[in-house]
Every structure is written in structure tokens, then in C-alpha cells.
Amino acid sequence: MSAWGYAALLAIPLAAAALRCVRPWFALNAIVSLSCAAIVLAVRGAVSPLFFGLIVSVAADWFMAHKAGRTGWYLCGIGGFFAAHALFLWDVLLDASLAPLPFLAFALLAAGYGLYLARRILPRVSDARMRLAIVLYMLISAASLGFSLAAPGAARTLGLLCIVLSDTLIAESDFAGNRAAGAWILPTYFLCHILLALSAVVERGM
């Protein structure tokens, strides 16, 4: 199949994402991520860290969607997404040039986002385990996004930027009391996975 044929398959996660935004069915979340993972697998012809990161995201998303105020489940969700980001970072590092730029980008992102968390989010989080999980997750997110700047493909960087934005919206909604932010969590999350799948298609050559 040509790269354009694989790109056409992105209609599957796009349709599932659009339907999920109007119907509260978790199965649609899984369809978005799993179909993106299938596209990555088909395009690359072998399993890869990106493929496994998308698969792990399904389990992490399940815990987040069903946490219902349970801190333990919330922590499982964060832990799952931490693992997914570690896999995304691994995938980035396979292509990235370890020049000074990504290290500088990581440092700036970690410092800026750390300041945001310290001032707006962490003071509102009473559970010490949750605070630690949030900080560690911020660091892996900053690393995957920062190092993506040294790897080819704007779609991958934009995808990782979308997941950071989605996570920020979750923090705003769950900890800062900004309920309006919740409306954009799923669209940005789904866009992340679709862009990551697109990045694999672009690698093939469009």
C-alpha cells in the first residue's frame, strides 16, 4: 500500500474521535489509539516503541476514564501514561540527533512547566504520591517533547505537544477547578495519537 493509502486509513481514528466527542463510550477511545497503533505497525512493518506506546496508552486511558475519585486508579493512569511517554521518548531517540538543542529544549520546558505546576497545581494537591507522580510525569513529557525537536518530522512534535496540552487541561480541570478546560481534553488527546500515526506515514514518504 502507498503512503497515501495508509494516510487514508487515518479516517478510522478520525471518525472514532469525532463520535467519541459526542458519545460517552470508552470503546471509542480504544478504537482511536488501537487503530493508530495498527497504522504505525502496518507502515513500519514491525513493532516499534511508538506502536507499544499507543497500546499502553489504552490501558492508561482506561484507568483515567474510570478513576471516579479513586486516587490509586488515578496514579495507575499517570503511571501508564508515564510508560507511554517513555516509549515515545525511546522512539524519538532512535531518530534524534543528540545535539545541544534538545537538551536545551528539555531544560526550558521542564523549568517552565515546573514553575506552572509549582504555582498553580501542586499547592492544590494534598496527596504526596500524587504530587510526586505529577512531577515525574512532567519530566518525561518535557523530555519526549524536547528531544522530538531534534528528530525529523513535524507531525511527531505536534503530536507530543498535543498530549502535553491535553495533560495540562486535565490538571486544570481536576486540580485547579477549571471545569471549562475539560471540554478540550479528548480532542487534544486524540489529535496527539492521530498525529503520531501520521508521523509514521510521513516517514514512509508522501
Which functions belong to the PLM regions below?
Residues 1-206:
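Polytopic alpha-helical membrane-helix bundles and their juxtamembrane interface segments
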